[in-house]
Structure formats: C-alpha cells, structure tokens
Amino acid sequence: MQTKKDSFKRWLPLIGLTFAVFVFNTTEFMPIGLLSDIASDLHVSEARAGMLISVYAWVVALMSLPLMIVASRMELKRLLLTIIAVFVVSHVASALAEGYYTLMLSRIGMACSHAIFWSIAPPLAVRTVPDGRRALGLSTIATGSSVAMVVGLPLGRVIGLYVGWRVTFFSIAVITAFIFLFILAVFPRLESRGRFSIKQLPSLLRNRVLLGVFLLSVLFATAHYTGYSYIEPFLGKIAGMSPNTVTLTLIVFGGAGMLGSISFSKFYMANRRRFIFVTTAAPTLCLLLLLAASVNVWLTMLLCVVWGAMATAFNIAFQDNTIRFAPENATSIGMSIFSGLFNLGIGCGAYVGGLVVSHASLADIGYAGGVIGVLMTVYCVARFFPNMCKREARR
C-alpha cells in the first residue's frame, strides 16, 4: 500500500506541470475564441485584434533565449513559481485593461512568463517522471495543451459571450493561483544542470539536425496559424456555422489533440521518421482542403479532427527531437530556442492570416497556410531526414 502511495506521489509534479500547461496554452490562444468580442468591445478591427496573438508570439520568440540564459542557474522550482506568479498578475491586469494598448501591454507580461515556461516545461516533464517513461511524460503535458483547446478555449469563449471577455481572463488568474499553490506543495527542488553561456551558442547551432528541427518548427507554426488564428470568423462567416456550432467545432479541434498525444505515445518510437512525415504532410493537406470542406459541417469537423490531432503530434515529436539532439547541459536552452522560433511562427502565421483577411479574402486562409506547409514537407523529406539519419548513425 505504501509503495502505491509513494508511486502516486512521484507523478504529482507532472500533474501540477500539466495543469500549468493547461492555463498557459489556454491564455495564449484565448483571443482566437474571443476575437470578434474583443474587437467589438475595444472598437478595433478583427485583424487588429488578431495582433494580440501575433505580438504575444513575437515577444515569446524574442525573449525566450535571453530570459532563459539569464535564468539558467536558477533552481527550477523557484523559477517555475516565479513565472507562474507573473502570469497571474498579468491576467488580472488584462481583466482590468481599459483599452487596446493596455491589454496589449498585459499580454506582453504573460508572454515573458510564457517564454521561460515553455523552455523548462518539457525538460521538467522528462526529469520528474520515473525512468523509461519519457514519452509518457511528454505526451502528458501535451494532453494539458489539448485539454486547453477542448475545455479552456471554448469555455473561455462561452464565458466571454455571456459575461464578457474580461471575466474570462480574471477566471484564468484565479485558476492559476490555485495551481501555484499545488506546485508549491508537491514539486521537488531541482537544480539547474549548469549555467549556459552565450559563447556556447555557436556550437549548439552547428548541429544540423537541431537546426532542421528549428526550421521545420517555424514553418509548421507559420502554416498552421495562418489558418487557425482566424478559424473562428472562418467557421462563422465562410462555413456558415451558428455561434454554438463554432464553439463545438473548436472543442472538436482541441479534443483531437488528445488523439495526437495518444498516437505519439503509441507509435512514435516505433518509426520516428514515418511519424514525423505524417505530422507534417497531414496538416498541410487539411489546410489546402479547408475551404472545400466548409460546404458541409460534418466534413469541416472531420477535417478539424485530423488537423488538430496531427498538429499536437507534430509539436510533441519536435519537442522530443529538441531534447534528444541538444547537449545535456543545454536542453532548456534548446527548448527556449524551439519555443521562441515556434512562437515566431505563430506570430508570422497570425500576421500572414491577417494580411490574407485584409487584402484577399477570409476564405483563402487555408490556401495561404497550405502553400507554406508544402514547403515545410518538401524540406522535411529532402534535407531533414537525410541529416537525421547521418546524425543517428554517428551516435
């Protein structure tokens, strides 16, 4: 009985980390589900409201590496609690924001905490789970991301529709405060594995496989968020869905991420290259078919299942590759670069989507993202896989 109790306690830090992933992912994409509401309340266009996503992502992209280098010697539990506290304060500021730029400033505070969080979350998941459970640890925190899409983002949208988007942000602040207390109680002290100097960065960037991981991550995020950042108005205005059906479709999209998480834990290690190819090619195809599928609600939902599942699976697989190919004393730095570049892609995708909406048509966001996805898939097959094979042959 005591053994089972001790075994359960070993998983509590991962549970706390997964809850934290839930709120961090919920808030990053909260404006997607509330885009129309925020734009109307602040008297700005939907494209300008979409910049709340872009700027958030660009701040993460710019600040991930410098903030992580500064914090690289800090004890990890203390670091985790500090960034969660900043996250809570920033959400309260968002709820009280009087205008567009005040809201943008509070989002920048969230983005700075996010920049460090996603640099340390995957390595922490690997370090806190029992030996041999690496894939399960990574897939568990990915489940937190999926639940954010299933419950967090749609619930935030529902709250926003009925009582206002400000209450949504305040609710996240309250939930995150409880998560802070849980992590304070259960998380062990974990010392950093050494300070990383900026002088070591060139050697890290000479790793061709790691560079390929980073490039594919930027391309994927840009392609994905060109379409996904404007999925809410697309579903309402192009697919002709009612507000309730839009919410349901967002839930389906997020819920499919759990399928991606399960598929990673089941199939990834058996054939990593095949898994990676599927997770690059399938979302690309979904983007290209988005407009064609919009003629039917069920076709759109089916497409969202495949798209959502493969997007999550891609993210976990490339987090694993970052940790796998980065030097042991630089896994957090490798993840900070991955997170920064992925968020650069998110910002670029939201920006490209905004350009398409403003200068072409909302209906064309899938085609724009799909073209970028084709470039990503070609690079993956032509350059990344050969470099990956050479690297693994030398290990």
What are these regions (language model features)?
Residues 43, 75, 96-102, 240, ...:
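Helix-breaking motifs and short loop linkers at transmembrane-helix boundaries and internal kinks
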Residues 62-98:
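Conserved MFS/SLC helix-loop-helix module at the cytosolic interface between two early adjacent transmembrane helices
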Residues 63-75, 260-272, 357:
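Helix-to-loop junctions at the C-terminal end of transmembrane segments
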Residues 86, 90-93, 101-109, 298-306:
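Paired small-residue
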Residues 102, 130-187, 230, 234:
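Helix-loop-helix hairpin linking two adjacent transmembrane segments in secondary transporters
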Residues 106-144:
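Cytoplasmic helix-loop-helix junction between adjacent transmembrane helices
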Residues 117-129, 313-327:
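Intracellular juxtamembrane helix-capping segments at the cytosolic ends
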Residues 325-361, 369:
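A late C-terminal transmembrane helix in Major Facilitator Superfamily
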